[in-house]
Amino acid sequence: MVMKSGRYIGVMSGTSLDGVDVVLAAINDKVVAQQASYSHPFPYELKQKILAVCQGQQTTLSAIGRLDYELGSLFAEAVQGLLIKTGLTASDITAVGCHGQTVWHEPNSHTPFTMQLGDNNRIAALTGITVVGDFRRRDMAYGGQGAPLVPAFHFAVLGHLTERRIILNIGGIANITTLLPGSPVKGYDTGPGNMLMDSWVWRHQKKPYDKDAQWAREGVVNNKLLGQMLSDHYFSRPAPKSTGREYFNMSWLEAQLVNFPDIPPVDVQATLAELTAASVSQQIMLSGGCERLLVCGGGAHNPQIMSRLSALLPGTEVCPTDKYGLSGDDMEALAFAWLAFRTMSGAPGNLPSVTGASTETILGAIYPVINQ
């Protein structure tokens, strides 16, 4: 198999909706070398439209179609922003790997499906660059969860022959990849990451997130509320499993708070931070533990969560992936650049041991342009 080496751009917009992350990387079958990154702002009105769809409010086919168009335009703008920053042109890029914006993910129903919006045809037309997108549905077609897909990238770039490592990504949802020598790679969503904390601080302080956990650190964890939250059936389900904003959202949190009407909002924030740390730690211990926990995503900047992980996992070194040369803020965008490289090379991109698919498969669809 001849691998299609070159410069790739990865585009990621996660469940936190805090911006569009774009990275440039030189990729071949041996090396993924990040060369530049760029964060493109997410328009407030567009964010609110997406939240309305994600949280199960009524929508229409027309509204979904308009969102698909608007997100395609936004992702193209983000790619162009990176090109301007680097001085490169479309002809310098082999392909763009675009994850799209997940608005619904339902892998466990009788008719499992996942939906990511952001018209890849439009991205290709506006940028003049071949686009690889729609990565998740091929895995689901083979019986997989369609998620998480990033563990295959973690294994390729952070796997170790002898050291027990777990990669923790704390985005809107938190997920782990277990890289344990002699065992198949596993990866799954542990539960809420930043999503509930972000929504709660927005409701009460109109801030997009709790910077440096300043608010959470002023509060006191309510152990009864924490115990009730951790009794949710999702946390006890066996892997592989995946979840998202369609489940862990403000409606879920409000239902949890019905029996706790007098808890101060600041204590709820502290309890949500502890929920993330506790649910992650539980899953890590169930997997057999690790020597090193490498953390990426926005939550790696949350000192409260990082310190609680260290306390809950004695004997484990907790450190950011940046220590190993991989930007934690750009990890997922890098992964989709790498997945685009795999697809363009005709190579599989999923790990059945992670997603539960019946076979390895080439992921996504290619949207080529003429004379690139």
From Swiss-Prot:
EC number: 2.7.1.170
Family matches, as PANTHER family: ANHYDRO-N-ACETYLMURAMIC ACID KINASE (PTHR30605:SF0)
Functional pathway: Amino-sugar metabolism; 1,6-anhydro-N-acetylmuramate degradation; Cell wall biogenesis; peptidoglycan recycling
Protein name: Anhydro-N-acetylmuramic acid kinase
Keywords of the record: ATP-binding, Carbohydrate metabolism, Kinase, Nucleotide-binding, Transferase
Family as reported in the entry's similarity comment: Belongs to the anhydro-N-acetylmuramic acid kinase family.
GO MF, any single term: kinase activity
Main function: Catalyzes the specific phosphorylation of 1,6-anhydro-N-acetylmuramic acid (anhMurNAc) with the simultaneous cleavage of the 1,6-anhydro ring, generating MurNAc-6-P. Is required for the utilization of anhMurNAc either imported from the medium or derived from its own cell wall murein, and thus plays a role in cell wall recycling.
